[in-house]
Amino acid sequence: MQRAGVNPTFTWTPTAQTKIKLSYEYFRDYRTGDRGIPSQNGVPYDRAAPSTFFGNPALSNTPSTQNIVTALVDHKFDDGLNVRSQTRFADYKRFYQNVYPGSAVSASDTLTLSAYNNSNDRQNIGNQTDWTKKFSLGPTQHTFLFGTEFANQKSANARFSGFFTNNNSTTSTAIPASNPVSWQNV
């Protein structure tokens, strides 16, 4: 697993009543997707070490990145009214593919491998604005809150089944459970 991220933030206070905050976040995650140990007769296959990989680790990667920009403006008026508005744009890219046990281990100690890949790209933009007013009415203190929120999201998703090169027409291939790592091209 490899992860890295940064989130620099800049805050500017042009007046005692106004604060502006800008931030950018970048995050990257790369890991191998492991679907675990298959079962045999309804229990985990017990002839494999817990660290055994069933499938193909070189073809089971799950990289993702995210880029997020946020702007926040907070202003307090002299009459007790406060306005706080935050806008955020986010761009997410995620891809994962997996060569994994597609069946339980049979009585003859074989299993089938299956494969797929999936991509998911998403962009969000949104704004949340709150108006808050504190006031007294007789001996009672009140807080009045009014807010709006707007958002838009666009996504592009794709999913594909893997085909194995042993005949290039099936979405699974049989392997011995004693040698569960398959380096066949998918």
Language-model-derived ranges and their functions:
Residues 1, 22-28, 85-91, 146-152:
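Transmembrane beta-barrel strands of outer-membrane/channel proteins
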Residues 80-83, 130:
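Transmembrane beta-barrel domains of bacterial outer-membrane proteins
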Residues 4-7, 68-70, 127-136:
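Short alpha-helical segments and helix-capping/turn motifs at coil-helix boundaries
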Residues 19, 82, 141-145:
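Outer-membrane beta-barrel architecture
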Residues 122, 126-186:
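C-terminal low-complexity, acidic/polar tails when present
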